[in-house]
Amino acid sequence: MFDPYLDELNKLLIVNHGEILLVPDGLQECYSKKQDAVIRSWLWSVPGFRRWRVTRMDVGDKLQVFNSVAYPDYLNEQPIMGIDLLWFGIKNKLVAVLDFQPLVQEKSYFDRYYQGLKSLKARYSDFNSKDNVRAYDLSNYFSPWVLLCKGDLFQASSSLPFVFSEFLNAYFDISNNFKKYNSRIEPNRVKELQISYDIYSSAHDPAHGLFKSYFGKQWSERFLKEFLFPHSIAKDKT
């Protein structure tokens, strides 16, 4: 179900001069020993970004997962990009969460970087869900305009393709023009905030339990610390 989104993102990263990097050994692909499931991940080097990761999990008709997170360079204070798409085939249920995840919860920061996301939120009512998704703590590292959809096949086949494309374009519009935003957060502080994001996310990642159930605790712990949120390791060593 989500392969077209993977292809679209890959093409966009290539257009923006992205290059594939090596994923830590043993984490680029894993097959479940208990169930018919596979997870694959990619890491990109993209100008203007410190790290751009992508993950695709395939459990056939039962479950489909697509995730991507982009970390801007430390010289760029723009939000972290986060995408989570989940399709529960047995229940015909879509959960989609797309956001420019803010480094700080400040009005001036929102005024600088969220006009595009605000516009998307206003135009796509399907992604303006008032219901929180239990797995996500929307009070931390989410913006007031997070695109949240709890839908079914109708939303998955109608509005999601357009939201996905426009969301990516809005995010790249910020990065391609970041100099005009007059970044006000110093690079060292941006680094600290991105480290804090990884530390928090590694402790609260809603997908970690899912990964453990399919791929085991040992592999999932490595995946969490070494691929998903590698900056969280700094805390473990202090």
Curated annotation (Swiss-Prot):
GO BP annotations of the record are:
phytochromobilin biosynthetic process
User: What Enzyme Commission number(s) apply to this enzyme?
Assistant: 1.3.7.2
Which controlled-vocabulary keywords does the entry list? Oxidoreductase
Question: Would you say which domain of life the source belongs to?
Answer: Bacteria
Q: Gene3D superfamilies, per this entry?
A: 3.40.1500.20
Catalytic activity field: 15,16-dihydrobiliverdin + oxidized 2[4Fe-4S]-[ferredoxin] = biliverdin IXalpha + reduced 2[4Fe-4S]-[ferredoxin] + 2 H(+)
How would you classify this enzyme at the top EC level? oxidoreductase
> Per UniProt, what is one Pfam family of this protein?
Fe_bilin_red
Q: Which GO terms describe its molecular function?
A: 15,16-dihydrobiliverdin:ferredoxin oxidoreductase activity; cobalt ion binding
Q: Which family does it belong to?
A: Belongs to the HY2 family.
Q: What does this protein do?
A: Catalyzes the two-electron reduction of biliverdin IX-alpha at the C15 methine bridge.
User: What is the protein's given name?
Assistant: 15,16-dihydrobiliverdin:ferredoxin oxidoreductase
